[in-house]
Amino acid sequence: MKKRLLTLVLMLLSLAGCAGQGNEDIPKTGAYTFEDDLGRTISVDKPERVAALTGSFADIWCLAGGEETLVAAAGDSWTSFDLSLSEHVVNLGAIKTPDMELLLAAAPDLVLVSSNTAAQLALLEPLEQAGLTVACFNVTNFSEYLRMLEICTGLTGDGEAY
């Protein structure tokens, strides 16, 4: 609950601090290109099916306007972040041991992975070998949070959410 409250406070602060600085010029269609926190260039069309391997990333994705496209999320999305996700969102289990079979069955076209979690980084190669686009983020402070939110709003095409 505290994490959810912190996320809400951070979001409110970002809205107040970024008034008039939204991503209004974000294209609604076509490929969106960005650099993830491993320094890799990622280029992806607007995702229609997204998996988030941490609850905080599921929260950011939903705040960025992607709630309808979230198809799989870590278990803490419901327990720690109390997100009201669709009944169709697959619970992947624990952050450090996401269920790969369920993840692959959800058929995401984008997977949001924490570069802070060794177990998730270990999934990077197998996920990419399975043909999935994987973006790694390291969100430990407010500026990193805003950076991920900006990228996610770019991906969803919802500049107003930033």
PLM features per residue range, with description:
Residues 30-31, 41, 122-162:
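Extracytoplasmic substrate-binding proteins
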Residues 29, 37, 45-48, 65, ...:
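Extracytoplasmic
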Residues 10-17:
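Hydrophobic core
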Residues 47-51, 69, 133:
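Residues that mark the start of a beta-strand
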Residues 6, 62-65, 124-125:
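Short amphipathic alpha-helical segments
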Residues 52-106, 110-117:
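A short, structured surface patch at a secondary-structure boundary
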Residues 4-5, 17-59, 159-162:
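Bacterial Sec-exported substrate-binding components of ABC uptake systems
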